[in-house]
Amino acid sequence: MQVVVVATTLSLLGFDKASAQGGAAVTAYSPYTMFGIGELQTIGTTQMRAMGGVGVAWRSTQMPSMINPAGYSATLQNSFLFNVGVEGNFLQNAQKQYGASGDFTRMAKNGKNSVNIHEIAIQFPLAKGLGMGLSLMPYSSVGYKMSFLDQRDEIAGNVGAAAYTYSGDGDVTEVKLGIGWEPFKNFSFGVAAKYYWGKISHNYVSEVANNIVGSSSFLSVIGEDEYAISNFKFQVGLQWNAIANDKRMLTFGATYDYGGGLRPKVTKSLVLNNSYETDVVRETGISQMQLPHSVKAGVMYHDPKFMAAVEYEFQAGGSGNSGRIEEKGNNN
């Protein structure tokens, strides 16, 4: 039996003691991740991600096919493929801060560091021309924190300076189990079931930093939206070897990912604090958060010394994630 084990480690890009924060590892740190399911991760092995995430036409006997299930059929008899990838990130966000007059005061920076297992994949043969693959990898990540101190005269003169903070964290993980079959020489077909699970939390805090006695009983508002995701989707894929010999290989590939509603359970809570009491409001429901329907097509050429690939992807996301968009007033 041939056993191929691939373990890849990406070194940590940097470490800032002043901004390092504990807690769960994060792979995104951007205000744009506050929408939908967050920032989509580049999937695949390290080699695939190093080439920009190409892999729909990737066909190898020594590397798991993590993007196209049709590639599972390339697994050699009496072999077993196992891949582990470790990723390190130093993520930093910078925001301009302005004073009450609207003039720029300083550049505020914040960052997070993480080291985490990125993907785990195994692939093995079931019969001649028939293979199975199982993989676990991150699908999307949420990580952001933004703050604003409102010192306008009409606010500060009534209740004091008001501080607003928006933050969020979480991720969605993808587990894929599929089968690839080569019914004809150089032509393969694959199907895979995908399970998505994870939790995403969005938080909002509004508080009076310098409460003026007697002017208002309002102190703070704390809100949290938590999404619990657990849903199945599926994928189909094709691969065709136009050229396949000992010197070079030219492969065409395509996949279709069925998206649609994730229908996560969402729990919304609101805590109102004032000088006299604390009120808590909580409600649960089902969100319309969804994944896009996706079509990929590509071609890959490689020989012992050279490899190149080109891919095209079309995603139809719909409007199911628009509920996360919030309208905000002018904060100067």
Label each residue range with its predicted role.
Residues 18-50, 121-332:
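Outer-membrane beta-barrel porins/channels
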Residues 17-138:
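N-terminal, post-signal peptide beta-strand-biased segments of exported outer-membrane/organellar beta-barrel
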Residues 1-22:
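Bacterial Sec-dependent N-terminal signal peptides
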